[in-house]
């Protein structure tokens, strides 16, 4: 392919330019991706850690706010008065009365006397005003008495009797009271994905539960700080439970995805860090994560006995965009250098080959008997020396030929 000297010289120059270029691009990619990967991973871990601290503050703030309702003298007095109706009744009679309302509850309209008494009494108006001040964060608030019957609510609840529900039993805690947070779930009554804050209302001595308040918080508003995190086109944060369920993120409906078991096992072994793995959508990603550390503000059985983690992740192709941009720049510079090498090599090759072509043509003419042919090569190198030697040989041959004639 490159039989001529000129072609070989050009080929050699291209190879000399190409090999360092390939090595440079490879080292740039390997070194750059390693540094970028570590930098992004560390930054994502730090962002996840801050998000987890934010999450803890949000939950603790909500507990404090709901607790402020639970200790309100106005609410406590109303519940104490409501509980008086049980004093003159036996347990069977109480159960019978509660069941009689529970059985007809689904058929009752908002304008029925029973419902109006619950959603329009003075405590109901009080918690409605409180809910209004909180905006869209609270989807529903209601209060039960000591037996689990709803006595005040912002709107009609799905059930009248609540004492057979897990959340009520946890918050009641055998009459001793305990702050309980439910697992995130879809609430049929409020029609939202919700986190329920269940706070016991204690008597004045703070030793006996007299009622329970339940606040149903819409997680889209409660966790807006998670939803609003965006990094580039694909980067965002997720709130993930220890069973792998993505509770909420910026791009999917709540509770609609699960991450792979390998990833959840990896993060469960650490309180925080970063890793490379497939995210909940099966996309290779850089993922920073941090465990949400809770205090002692709620019972250990809260949140479905699950841990929560914050993920901050981004698709790897997008994360590596700066490296790809650098590679393009390095490649363009490499192509330009190869072009320059080629042009320089072509110029040098022509300077080398031109005397050789003159030499070739001249030797051919001398060989044909034209002994007066002289090689006009003035280069001060081996080719010039060879041309002078051939010229001397031609002169000698010409003289000998003339003598013979």
Go through each PLM region and give its residues:
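Solvent-exposed, extracytoplasmic
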Residues: 50, 74, 80, 111-137, ...
């Amino acid at each position: 392919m490159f039989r001529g000297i000129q072609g070989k010289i050009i080929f050699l120059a291209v190879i000399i330019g190409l090999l360092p270029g390939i090595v440079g691009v490879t080292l740039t990619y390997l070194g750059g991706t390693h540094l970028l990967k570590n930098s992004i991973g560390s930054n994502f871990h730090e962002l996840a850690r801050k998000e987890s601290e934010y999450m803890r503050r949000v939950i603790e703030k909500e507990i404090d706010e709901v607790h402020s309702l639970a200790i309100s003298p106005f609410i406590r007095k109303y519940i104490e008065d409501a509980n008086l109706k049980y004093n003159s009744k036996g347990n069977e009679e109480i159960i019978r009365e509660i069941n009689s309302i529970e059985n007809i509850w689904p058929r009752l309209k908002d304008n029925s006397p029973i419902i109006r008494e619950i959603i329009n009494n003075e405590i109901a108006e009080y918690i409605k005003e409180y809910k209004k001040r909180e905006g869209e964060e609270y989807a529903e608030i209601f209060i039960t008495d000591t037996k689990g019957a709803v006595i005040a609510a912002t709107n009609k609840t799905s059930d009248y009797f609540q004492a057979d529900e897990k959340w009520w039993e946890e918050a009641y805690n055998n009459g001793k009271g305990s702050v309980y947070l439910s697992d995130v779930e879809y609430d049929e009554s409020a029609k939202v994905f919700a986190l329920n804050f269940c706070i016991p209302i204690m008597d004045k001595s703070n030793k006996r539960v007299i009622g329970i308040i339940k606040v149903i918080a819409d997680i889209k508003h409660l966790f807006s700080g998670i939803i609003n995190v965006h990094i580039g086109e694909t980067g965002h944060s997720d709130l993930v439970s220890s069973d792998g369920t993505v509770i909420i993120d910026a791009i999917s409906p709540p509770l609609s995805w699960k991450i792979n078991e390998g990833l959840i096992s990896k993060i469960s072994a650490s309180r925080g860090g970063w890793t490379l793995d497939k995210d909940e959508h099966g996309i290779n990603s850089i993922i920073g994560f941090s465990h949400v550390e809770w205090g002692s503000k709620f019972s250990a059985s809260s949140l479905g006995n699950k841990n929560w983690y914050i993920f901050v992740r981004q698709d790897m192709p997008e994360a590596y965009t700066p490296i790809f941009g650098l590679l393009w720049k390095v490649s363009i510079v490499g192509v330009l250098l190869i072009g320059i090498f080629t042009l320089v090599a072509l110029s040098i090759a022509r300077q080398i080959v031109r005397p050789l072509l003159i030499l070739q043509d001249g030797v051919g003419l001398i060989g044909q008997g034209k002994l007066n042919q002289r090689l006009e090569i003035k280069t001060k190198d081996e080719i010039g020396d060879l041309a002078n030697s051939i010229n001397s040989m031609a002169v000698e041959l010409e003289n000998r030929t003339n003598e013979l004639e």
